[in-house]
Amino acid sequence: MAIKRSSQDPHSPLHPPHISPSEKKNKPHQDHRLLETGRLEETEAAEDSIRPRNLNDYIGQKELKEVLKIAIGAAKVRKEALDHLLLYGPPGLGKTTMALILAAEMGVNCKITAAPALERPRDITGLLINLKPGDILFIDEIHRLNRMSEELLYPAMEDQRLDITTGKGKSAKIRSIPLSPFTLIGATTKIGALTSPLRDRFGLIQRLRFYEVDELCLVVLRTAKILNAKIKEEGALEIARRSRGTPRIANRLLKRVRDYALVKKIESITEALAAEALDKLNVDSRGLDWTDRLVLDTIIQQFRGGPVGLETVAAATGEDAKTIEEVYEPYLLQIGYLNRTSRGRIATEAAYQHLGYDYIFNRKIN
């Protein structure tokens, strides 16, 4: 069993004590959406107001921007549409924003949709037929396209035509409709879930990575300026450190800290104020929330640090296994607090230290 270091404050939100089953059922009220990386309907308009409008304003992803600048320049010289582009990586890193920027740089329109909305063939055919020369069609969660919609994209991407089958059996006929040259930009968090025929039709396949703290600090400072929120650089750094490497989360946390400063009648966001506000929101110094810490604490306390299976962790914490795997684990893996092995999940020494436990490598001590 892991031993809690007595030097830690037992009531600190950053180093919680062992979480009992009763405490798990009565978890503190927290807006879990703060650290979610998915877009929220009520914040989409606000997000649009702070999106960068061109590549020069887009912070981070240096390697990606260099590749895209070359692609844009070449397409303009040839007077052609951009090559089809597949963007993959964790949510909240700016895939939709990049599609809008590319449309602005090329001087064309960008139509945005998501694969779950394209349930019937006519949903995607309507979009394709109405595209003008050079337009961009952005499909989010493209790995979730159904087979029929995906197959309609094959000739559209390769030959700028739409093949529609009419009739059945021996009387079936294929009618080809010419399309304007266009660019398909697909976004996915699961590139491995794409079929090879679809993936191979993209001329450019680029990965978006998590942001560094200094990059997120620039994001926070830029957003604060747009929102007319006064903030010290140290305050921006504190928010950046707790933003899980994700701009969308950084902007969301900034707004909550801004509100906290407003209620407290404090003119400028300092490091101390940002830390105080985020501690009250249960977002700790590494960006972990209550559920992140619960998952790690459960693995350490109940299963001696692991290895333990995902379903077992889910049952022990009362959280959905898919939610743990897709929402919480990616960041825990990224910062080195969790290892995912064939035998199960293992909490690392860094996780022990962060939660205030003594790390015992050989946990099978009698």
From Swiss-Prot:
It comes from the Bacteria. Residues 13-211 are annotated as: Large ATPase domain (RuvB-L). PANTHER family: HOLLIDAY JUNCTION BRANCH MIGRATION COMPLEX SUBUNIT RUVB, PTHR42848. This is Holliday junction branch migration complex subunit RuvB. GO terms for biological process: DNA recombination; DNA repair. Has 3 domains, the large (RuvB-L) and small ATPase (RuvB-S) domains and the C-terminal head (RuvB-H) domain. The head domain binds DNA, while the ATPase domains jointly bind ATP, ADP or are empty depending on the state of the subunit in the translocation cycle. During a single DNA translocation step the structure of each domain remains the same, but their relative positions change. Keywords: ATP-binding, Cytoplasm, DNA damage, DNA recombination, DNA repair, DNA-binding, Hydrolase, Nucleotide-binding. It comes from Gloeothece citriformis (strain PCC 7424) (Cyanothece sp. (strain PCC 7424)). Residues 21-42 have a biased composition (Basic and acidic residues). HAMAP family: DNA_HJ_migration_RuvB (MF_00016). Residues 212-282 are annotated as: Small ATPAse domain (RuvB-S). ATP binds at residues 50-51, 92, 95-97, 201, 211, 248. It is found in: Cytoplasm. It catalyses: ATP + H2O = ADP + phosphate + H(+). NCBIfam families: PRK00080.1 (NF000868), ruvB (TIGR00635). Mg(2+) binds at residue 96. GO terms for cellular component: cytoplasm; Holliday junction resolvase complex. One of its GO terms (molecular function) is ATP hydrolysis activity. Residues 1-49 are annotated as: Disordered. Residues 285-366 are annotated as: Head domain (RuvB-H). DNA binds at residues 340, 345.
